[in-house]
Every structure is written in structure tokens, then in C-alpha cells.
């Protein structure tokens, strides 16, 4: 059987027409107005950037002043004059067969060549230290990018710079975890979780060892001058060691520059973090009762060495910190206190025997 037809439905009001978007009228600029047209300035300053980060970033990328350009131009002109005068002396000595003067010109050429080679080597190492900041910025962009094609080559370059062999287990796990459908953010993130912790663990061990040596040296040494010289020497060794672990070869000027950047970073951001992390344990009555004055000074020196190593690690590291993987000063503090207590107990028990 067929179903009966439905009754007709009458609407009281007519159907409403769908609103259509009206296009704006065309706006044209005259030639005079186009000359005075200027795009609006967009403030792209990151909100999370603090004073310390801005200061370190400005130190890493210094602006070339007029005086610096004048000094560099004067040095270049002086070098060209020395080379030209040396060539003229050599030609005159050859024409007059003045062999003594010719030998002096040859010795001067060797000295100038050695000096130029040293300057070029120092400049290359200093440029490599500055380039690490650009690599860290590039890694930060890749960690927020959804593009494809740059992440794998970037991570392979970082592994090569750090001296990680292709047969390393961590690098093999990274190769097994990546595939063609992943974007740059995922590939760099896998590298940060699988390969980068290998270098970070070595840097942490170096920081712990150097901090413990500084703590014990200050705690047992009676001479303040020896303490200062020892701490300065060990801190420089620590910076060199961390830079080598992350594939940065330091020269004289690049070493001074890194040391200055580390001290600058500590001066801006270190005091508040040091007070926050050391805080209650440092002011604890129990700790003050158990440790002597020299032991407390040793812990302070060890904490400063650890802080120096953490900041050097942050400046030499090719990737930014993610997922709260930054080393904390509290971890080294507990380790230093434990080692110092163990050493003091051994020193007290040895005379009794």
C-alpha cells in the first residue's frame, strides 16, 4: 500500500534571504600619497625574553661601532703597508745582492706569516663560538616549525660537530625513530631526547667533578691565595672541557669571550636563582651546626663552580632547553654536601685509629 500524501504546509512569513557580504569600495592612492606611505611597525618582541637573556644576546651579537671600524681599518692599512714595504726591501736586496738583508726579509716574512695564521685561526674559533648562538636560534625555530626537509640535515651537522660517530647507539636509535612523514619539529625533538642527552650527561659529570674538587680544596687549604689561583685555573679548565664536549674549539680570544659571557650571565640571572635554589638548606641551622667555616666556604666555592659550568653548558649547547631538562643547582648542592660530609667523617675517624 502506498503512503498517503502529506498535507501542504503554509508559512506565515516569506523566506528570508541569506545575507551576502558586501565588498568594500576600491581605494586608490595618488602618486603623492604613495610616496609618503609607510607600513605599520609590528612589535615582534618576544614576551618571555627577560633582561638576562636580552643582555647575553646583545653580548653575543655586538653592534660594530664607528671607533671599532676605524681601528680595524687602520690595522688593515698598516698591515698592507708592512707587506708592501717588505716586498720593496726584498726586491732591493735581490737586485743589490745584499744576502744579509735578504735573509732578514725572509725571517720577517716567516714571522708575519705566522702572525697572520694565528690571527686567522683565532678569528675562525671566535666565529665558531658566535655561530653556535645562530645554530641555537635555528634549532628554536625548527622546534616550532611544521615544515619538512631541514631537520635531519641540521641534526646530522650537530652530531658531526660534536664528534658523535655514525655507529653510536644513541644516533642509531634516532635514525630508527625518524621517518619521511615527520616534520622538522618532530625530528629535532627526537634528536633532543635521544642524542643530545649523551653530551649533556658527560657535561654534568664534568661539572660535578670540578665542583667537588673545588669544594674539597677550599675546605682543606689554609692559604687563601692558593685557593683563588686553584679555583680560577679549574674554572677555566671546566669551560674548555665543556666547550670541547659540544664541538667548540676555543682559542685565546674566544676563551676570554666565553668566560666573559658566562660571568655576565651569572651577574644578571645568577643571584636570584642561587638564592632560590640554595635557600633554606644554606641557612639551615642543622647544616650550620654540622659544617665548619672552611667547609661552608668550600661548599660556596663548589656551588659557584657548578653555576659557572651550567652557564657555560647553556652557551655552548646547540639546542635550547626543553621539557625542563636544564641542570639545577640543587642537584649539585646535595652531591657536594654529601661528599664533604663523607670526607670530614673519614678525616675524623682516621686520627682515632
UniProtKB/Swiss-Prot annotation:
Q: Name one Pfam family in it.
A: DUF697
Q: Where is this region: Disordered?
A: 1-35
The primary site where this protein sits is membrane
Annotated Gene Ontology cellular component terms? plasma membrane
Keyword Transmembrane (UniProt): yes
Instruction: List, as start-end ranges, the regions of compositional bias called Basic and acidic residues.
Output: 1-19
Alphabetically ordered keywords of this record: Cell inner membrane, Cell membrane, Membrane, Transmembrane, Transmembrane helix
Annotated compartments: Cell inner membrane
User: Where do the TM regions start and end?
Assistant: 70-90, 100-120, 213-233
| Membrane topology value | Multi-pass membrane protein
Record-stated family:
Belongs to the UPF0283 family.
PANTHER family linked: UPF0283 MEMBRANE PROTEIN YCJF (PTHR39342:SF1)
Name this polypeptide is given: UPF0283 membrane protein YcjF
Q: Which organism is it from?
A: Salmonella agona (strain SL483)
Q: What is the lineage of its organism?
A: Bacteria, Pseudomonadati, Pseudomonadota, Gammaproteobacteria, Enterobacterales
Whichever gene encodes this chain, its name is ycjF
